[in-house]
Amino acid sequence: MAAAAAAVVGWLGWVLAAFCLGSTAGEAAPAPGAGLLNFCTEEDSAPGAGSLRGRAAPEATLCLRLFCSGLANSSWTWVAAEGAGCPEGGRATEPEEAAAPTGEWRALLRLRAEAGHPRSALLAVRVEPGGGAAEEAAPPWALGLGAAGLLALAAVARGLQLSALALAPAEVQVLRESGSEAERAAARRLEPARRWAGCALGALLLLASLAQAALAVLLYGAAGQRAVPAVLGCAGLVFLVGEVLPAAVSGRWALALAPRALGLSRLAVLLTLPVALPVGQLLELAARPGRLRERVLELARGGGDPYSDLSKGVLRSRTVEDVLTPLEDCFMLDSGTVLDFSVLASIMQSGHTRIPVYEEERSNIVDMLYLKDLAIVEPEDCTPLSTITRFYNHPLHFVFNDTKLDAVLEEFKRGKSHLAIVQKVNNEGEGDPFYEVLGLVTLEDVIEEIIKSEILDESEDYSDTKVRKKTVALGAPLKRKEEFSLFKVSDDEYKVKISPQLLLATQRFLSREVDVFSPLRVSEKVLLHLLKHPSVNQEVTFDESNRLAAHHYLYQRSQPVDYFILILQGRVEVEIGKEGLKFENGAFTYYGVSALTAPSSAHQSPVSSRQLIRHDVQPEPADGTRSCTYCPDYTVRALSDLQLIKVTRLQYLNALLATRAQSLPPSPENAELQAIPGSQTRLLGDKSRETAGSTNSRPSIPVEESPGRNPGV
């Protein structure tokens, strides 16, 4: 409202300037006096036209037709001798007859030439005292100073209006409470001035209007009383100096200039107090200071909800058929599926929490499986999928293809479901109409339509194929997605049966808890293939009739060994030291770490999963030049049937070489170091045996072999 009032006052200022221009034009124009334009004689023998100076015969009577102006201004015409002046208030020579006006611009004058006195005569007219010559114009320097002063006054008034009075009281309070130090100081000085802001605004508007009107009058006089140049010049100067320049300066340094200009604002109010006071009261009544608070409260209540624009635009103009995922692109399960390890692995890799279940054909969706329903399902039980779906019996959510997105979003918000099955009535061809399933629509599809962007997550099976874009490669490599199917192998690959879950747990335990198998030494992929080797997975059958049988002893005191053992199932008895201290251990305890590394002493104690030894984890060089002998100072004996992991020193060294080969780029020089997953490079084993035999005087300890397979990894 304050800006509108300022615009109205500015318009009134221009009207006042135009009125002053008209009044000045009326006062500055001289009164219409008599002026001779031309004359001619009426006799045929005389010249047809003459100038102001003519020649006549003696005693001749002349009849002159005068063309002059100002005949109605009490003027008359007479003939005066050349060189004679015009007496004040009288005539120099009485004409024979006075000039008789015959029109607005014409008059008839009769003269008689005297004989014997040839002389020249001048035709003269009288002008009344009101029609004198115009006053002299002011000097150019005075006009320039006056115009500059008026422009400066208009610019200062406009600048004070834009700087000191532009901030609302609420904005000043916000700056005083939460602004910077400079802003707080400026706000404290401006806050009292906002109390008489209406009077100050009225005073500044009045001064700006007066300055612009006076400038228009001044330029009109300087332009020779020509209105068009005066108006254009005044408008250009006021626009550039009085509007643009204050707006540019105040827009950047408003808070810095406003506190320093408060004195000028008070002076303007004092000079124009009789007019500024009532105008200020009027502006304060029209400003409605509570409007800002009402708008803030409306936004706080949610009246200015930005979602309304989205719902009126995109969501109400598009249907679910525009954003659905076709049925052939959806991840679904058959109702006759058995939940074994491979099926559960595929569900986990899909990354979805809701999976449709169909019967016979994909368009016949009968159930919905939630990922949380599989929390208590064991892969070894091979539970039928129909058993799980009948137990939970999740409802299905169907929508028609012409349903608007805003309606679907409201249903999703109510928690009914975050996945809907889109169907339509197919009445094509002969026969009764039927429902045809087109695809699926999810909450993610609706959100992508709102934000007009693809949501990239770990799975995109339900993403909109119509707007799917190629994923931009990231600068940093993504973390490898866990491939659970690596742990699912054929049953005939093991001599000892090991479940995929136990294989996964063993691989993670060794890579995280045992330093010699950490990813820095042995990669997870190589370790996995090592654990899947038939000679590594072994069983010990406990003989109740002969508890002290030789095959019950995994380690014996002072007997050299070259293998590492991890107990997976069963219990063992450990006897330590000369005192013969005995204790029992169970699953996931391991022994013989020093057998895989460079021996630091002749005897080492057993290592459990709760007590790691850091000083014996440096691996021996792969060339096998050092001794492979390790003599434990403890005895480990089975107390029940055991399932264990047994890794020999040669197998461990081959795993180190395979890991090193994976980290090297492929080239002819390192071709011998290439390790193929799931197979064995015989060259590595042969070279290791040859090197060990050449550096050790006694034969190396043989490595377990299985038919058709090589002994290492």
Swiss-Prot record:
Glycans are attached at residue 73. Residues 664-713 are annotated as: Disordered. PROSITE patterns: CBS, CNNM. Residues 136-314 form the CNNM transmembrane domain. Widely expressed with highest levels in brain, kidney, liver, lung and heart. GO terms for biological process: magnesium ion homeostasis; monoatomic ion transport. Residues 324-385, 392-458 form the CBS domain. Gene3D superfamilies: CBS-domain. It is a multi-pass membrane protein. Pfam families: CBS (PF00571). It is found in: Cell membrane. The modification Phosphoserine is found at residues 667, 706. One of its GO terms (cellular component) is plasma membrane. Keywords: CBS domain, Cell membrane, Glycoprotein, Ion transport, Membrane, Phosphoprotein, Repeat, Transmembrane, Transmembrane helix, Transport. The chain crosses the membrane at residues 7-29, 137-157, 199-219, 227-247, 267-287. InterPro entries: ACDP, CBS_dom, CBS_dom_sf, CNNM, Ion_transp-like_CBS. Probable metal transporter. Belongs to the ACDP family. Shares weak sequence similarity with the cyclin family, hence its name. However, it has no cyclin-like function in vivo. This is Metal transporter CNNM3. It comes from Mus musculus. The gene is Cnnm3.
